[in-house]
Amino acid sequence: KEIFENPRTLKVAEISNDPPMNILQANIDSNKIKFEGIDVDVPNHLNNVKDKNFNLGIRASNIELSDNGFEFEVELAEISGSETLLHLKRGNSKIITSIEEVMNFNINDKVKINFDIDKVYAFNENGILASSPFGGSYV
């Protein structure tokens, strides 16, 4: 449970999740997390992150399709049992989301997603956990 909730490193975060945790290069500026033209409010658990530039971790299960979300492009859609794994990209960032139903998508389709900002992780530039939603930090 501790490894899942508070993975010490990026590598542990990637291998202890299936699909692997999404890792995005981000920065904090003016109390906003910014990446690939997306600005979201910094959640309380990331207020003490010291590095302006960091790696943002988002689990596939914490990303959902949303009419009011951020636009991404479909790179691949995999049907796995009763779920669909969507491989998405925006600029230089790539993510995977897990949808708990079988859905059909075409390569290059545009979809909108949102994610639960209160469940994101921050890893410093050395890949060490700086903050988790469960209070973990190794820096």
Region locations from a protein language model:
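ATP/adenylate-binding site constellation spanning eukaryotic-like Ser/Thr protein kinases
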Residues: N6-T9, N17-D18
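Non-catalytic connector elements of ABC transporters
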Residues: P19-I23, I28-V139
